[in-house]
Amino acid sequence: KESLYLFLLQKREENELSKAFTAYNTRIITPPTGDNKPVAPVRRNIMLVAFVLGFLIPVVIIFVRENMNTTVRGRKDLKNMNVPFLGEIPYYVSRKYRPTLEQRIRFWKKPKEVRQMVVKAGKRDIVNEAFRVLRTNFEFTIGTHPEQTVIIFTSLNPGSGKSHLAANMAMSLAIKKKKVLLIDGDLRHGSTSMLVGNPGEGLSDYLNGRIADIHDILHKGEESGLVKYFDVIPIGTIPPNPTELLFTPLLEQMIRQMRQEYDYVFIDCPPIEVVADTPIYEQFADRTIFVVRSGLMERSMLPEIDALYKEKKFKNMTMILNGTKTRGGRYGSHYGYGYGYGYGYGYNY
């Protein structure tokens, strides 16, 4: 016990000496301070990072989207083509048409075709101005060949807007008192026939012999809610054998007769890559207007149109670019969803 006591006493003395030594060599260099504000997170840094990310993410998305977009977007995509360029029509959505969010998502990659007459006498919006330019170019092209009065409208893709263009171009000419006949040659779809209410009798009924006189299926413009000098032949009954029906001699006879009665005969044909009807109409036509839809046709398909032109598969072929979204370009401003641009002068059209 004595030894244990001496051991503990020794340890106590050593501990006292150690405490005295440590206290002697320790001193406060900087007194401790405190702050009511947190050290982290720093709000300024967070806002700076958020601003940078908010700027960079949209830029990256736009860059990727633009580089992944392989469709025709404007006139510059057609600059290397050999096909004569007739004109362009800007993208247009009716004031009455208000697409829902679901419709905008559904048709994001495939623009909705406007199925209405936008050309009207005296209107000064950007679309009417574009059709005036198109009409002027068309008349200038036809001017040296006045006998070329039968024109077909076609495209590579469905939904290119050729029916809409053919109808409004016909209206533009009719306002100038040119007699124009628009024939709905798409015996499977019949978009143009909607202009006259899609009646039950039309071109197919004449070609199969059920209607003897072509004038019985001819709808006068002033009687159909259009204008004078603008007449329409609808498709009538949709036949089970459209292509075979076109081989009848009555088709050539009808076109020859209408050529004598009208200044221009427009034929709205199906897309050439869908059915074989268009080459049949082309035999009796003088000119071909090819419609390219901006945002729909792939740029990789443009050489196919050039090949058709070089190989002379279609007579006197020209091209129209439809649905261009102009932003500060030749038409002055972007046009869409009911926005109009007015000029300070008037037209009788």
Predicted feature descriptions by range:
Residues 1-36:
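Non-transmembrane alpha-helical coiled-coil
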Residues 29, 89, 233:
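Hydrophobic residues at beta-strand termini and immediately following loops
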Residues 42-179, 185-204, 208-215, 220-224, ...:
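Short boundary/hinge segments that flank catalytic cores
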Residues 45, 231, 263, 286, ...:
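Conserved acidic residues
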Residues 182, 232, 267, 290, ...:
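Structural beta-sheet core signal
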Residues 204-207, 232-277:
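Switch II (G3) loop of P-loop NTPases
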Residues 257-260, 274-295:
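Inter-motif core of Ras-like GTPase G domains
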